[in-house]
């Protein structure tokens, strides 16, 4: 790996800093993007915008026969997006965060499907969320190991 000093021949403290001339691979660039705080905050913001779009469609839903698709799709995507943003903050997912996300997903589906919180979930059931929980836990462990090595 070849490095080039920032300032050649100068006796300042900047001369000790080296910049790698090797271009970053696609995997390294994507990893840097996904681990950035701006990306994680962006996920939460996009999720909130999708939930707001759902509320806008809900107002005009009375004029459509099959308006549930106009309401449900952005709302579910928004809730999932918010949960992904919450889970990915700080690089790892604590059990408390995962419990919070499960509650948000289950409650939002309950409200979206019939307007009542009555555990009539069809998408975000306990079985499915527990299956996803294993994946979230393994990804969280992997991310925390990556953060420790950096």
Curated annotation (Swiss-Prot):
The gene is srp. The keyword Membrane applies. It is found in: Membrane. The lineage of its organism: Bacteria, Pseudomonadati, Chlamydiota, Chlamydiia, Chlamydiales. It is a multi-pass membrane protein. Keywords: Membrane, Transmembrane, Transmembrane helix. The chain crosses the membrane at residues 41-61, 67-87. GO terms for cellular component: outer membrane. This is Sulfur-rich protein, serovar D.
